[in-house]
């Protein structure tokens, strides 16, 4: 059993690293309006994972605080990334406008950790990540299908999602067994759903339950 640390790709305005990262151009840029890209326990701006300097800067922080202490696996949440307002024309990555190249973000986010871990001498690198794109498999991405509902409808959709991942050449894929939102443990229907989902999970590349 090993500890896996969850890391999100955004930084709060109140962080000790925020001003430095902003001045160095390591954050996703907002073309208009207030520079708040996600509201979650405060005002947040996303790291620009498409910027090689960002990947290096963040990994150095991760190495110092986690990898050097023995952490070998990371849970890369919010990898889409999850903007509070999906007005893609308002955001720009170092690699280009989000409207044009936005889908590469999760791949570059996985790359940020993979390349750092590899440089650190780690082998057999696998990190759990909430989103992926073509080429993510190159960077040790173990993708899960995100925060889904505890319903038979969402359960059925996982079959399609898993097939799509396989067709994209991404071998490591899983789901939140039983779903993420809305399950009531005392409900017999949910109990049946959980059993069926565990049966499905047995045949997935990775068997995993979340909360």
Residue ranges and their predicted role:
Residues 1-211:
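Catalytic-domain carbohydrate-binding cleft regions of carbohydrate-active enzymes
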């Amino acid at each position: 059993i090993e500890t896996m640390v969850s890391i999100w790709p955004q930084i709060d305005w109140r962080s000790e690293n925020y001003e430095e990262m902003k001045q160095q151009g390591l954050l996703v840029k907002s073309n208009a309006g207030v520079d708040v890209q996600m509201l979650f326990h405060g005002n947040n701006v996303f790291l620009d994972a498409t910027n090689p300097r960002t990947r290096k800067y963040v990994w150095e922080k991760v190495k110092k605080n986690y990898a050097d202490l023995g952490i070998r696996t990371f849970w890369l949440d919010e990898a889409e990334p999850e903007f509070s307002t999906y007005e893609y024309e308002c955001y720009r990555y170092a690699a280009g406008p989000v409207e044009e190249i936005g889908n590469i973000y999760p791949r570059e986010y996985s790359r940020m950790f993979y390349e750092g871990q590899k440089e650190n001498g780690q082998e057999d690198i696998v990190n759990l990540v909430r989103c992926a794109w073509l080429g993510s498999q190159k960077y040790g991405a173990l993708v899960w299908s995100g925060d889904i509902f505890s319903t038979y409808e969402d359960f059925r959709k996982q079959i399609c999602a898993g097939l799509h991942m396989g067709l994209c050449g991404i071998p490591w894929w899983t789901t939140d067994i039983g779903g993420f939102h809305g399950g009531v443990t005392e409900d017999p229907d949910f109990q049946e759903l959980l059993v069926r989902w565990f049966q499905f999970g047995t045949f997935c590349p990775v068997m995993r339950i979340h909360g």
